Design a protein with these regions (language model features):
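Catalytic core of DAGKc-family lipid kinases
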Residues: 7-8, 18, 56-61, 65-168
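N-terminal glycine-rich "phosphate-gripper" loop used for MgATP/nucleotide binding
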Residues: 41-45
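ATP/NTP phosphate-donor binding region
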Residues: 1-39, 49, 267, 274
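Short glycine/serine/threonine-rich phosphate/pyrophosphate-binding segments
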Residues: 24, 46-51, 70-72
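Active-site loop ensemble at the mouth of alpha/beta enzyme cores that anchors a bound cofactor
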Residues: 185-191
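ATP/nucleoside-binding phosphotransfer catalytic cores, i.e., glycine-rich phosphate-binding loops
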Residues: 156-158, 188, 198-274
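Glycine-rich phosphate/pyrophosphate-binding beta-alpha loops
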Residues: 113, 117, 170-185, 249
Length: 274
């Protein structure tokens, strides 16, 4: 990374390394306070989420250098995993203002969810992600398919939208989310709204049908998927369930308040800067 930056003429960048993504916000906030106008993030979706949470609504631009298992935000924005190309985009590409979602006071850029998806991510852990990669998601999903559904009530922009048994609820800011599936094909990260999907599938057969539709980018045609969009969501569960933000595990809750911050963060993307 240092060598690539040096070849681009950046010889002495301010440099921070952190052992875990949760340690990054403190360093990021210090860099922003010191006047950094461009911040390179070399890491996975968890690192990117933590840093966006710290940088959003400031004037600092983020350049993503993907180095995780899924790299979902980078994939949705067309940012390559090749370090040299990603750095070039950061220095010479255009800037795109993205919306961010906010769940229970914490920002996310790709997705947030509670239920089966969060159980999968919890069981994956950093160790399995590193060893098994995407196959780890398959293992974690199969392990949790027998998990009992829970009662959920959802309001979208203040209106009653869903009430019933569900396996998970997902909120998306982009189209391709968990496991690289296109669950929200209509989603755009700069359209001023979020997508929400409730999955009612239970058991292997139901999930096979649901995932089959998702692979074909037609999840809304599944009888086990309910999809809507809006600016605010109020999600209430009958008991505490684990939840996740951009693939990062969070402590179990039973109520989730979700909103959107439009055009909250600038991200470097492909194309020459104007």
């Amino acid at each position: 990374m240092r060598d690539v930056l040096a070849r681009e003429g950046v010889d002495a960048p301010l440099w921070y390394e952190v052992p875990k993504s949760k340690k990054a916000p403190k360093k990021v906030k210090q860099a922003v306070a010191d006047g950094a106008d461009l911040l390179f993030l070399w890491g996975g979706d968890g690192m990117v989420q933590r840093c966006i949470d710290a940088v959003a609504t400031t004037s600092t631009t983020i350049a993503i250098v993907p180095a995780g298992t899924a790299n979902l935000l980078a994939k949705n924005l067309g940012i390559p995993e090749d370090i040299e190309r990603a750095v070039h985009i950061g220095l010479h590409g255009s800037r795109r203002m993205l919306d961010v979602g906010v769940m229970n006071g914490e920002r996310f850029a790709v997705m947030a969810g509670a239920g089966l998806d969060a159980l999968m991510i919890r069981d994956m852990g950093d160790g399995l992600k590193g060893r098994a990669g995407k196959l780890g998601y398959v293992w974690a999903g199969a392990k949790n398919l027998a998990e009992q559904r829970f009662t959920m009530k959802v309001r979208v922009d203040g209106r009653r939208w869903f009430s019933g048994k569900a396996s998970c609820v997902l909120v998306g800011n982009v189209g391709t989310v968990l496991g690289g599936l296109s669950l929200f094909p209509q989603a755009l990260p700069d359209d001023g709204k979020l997508e929400i999907g409730v999955v009612t599938a239970r058991g292997l057969l139901d999930w096979a049908r649901t995932l089959g539709r998702s692979v074909m980018s037609r999840p809304e045609r599944s009888p086990f998927v309910h999809v809507s969009s809006g600016r605010t969501f109020d999600i209430r569960l009958d008991r505490k369930r684990p939840y996740e933000l951009d693939g990062g595990d969070r402590t179990s809750k039973k109520r989730f308040r979700v909103s959107i911050e439009p055009a909250a963060v600038a991200i470097c993307v492909g194309g020459d800067a104007s």
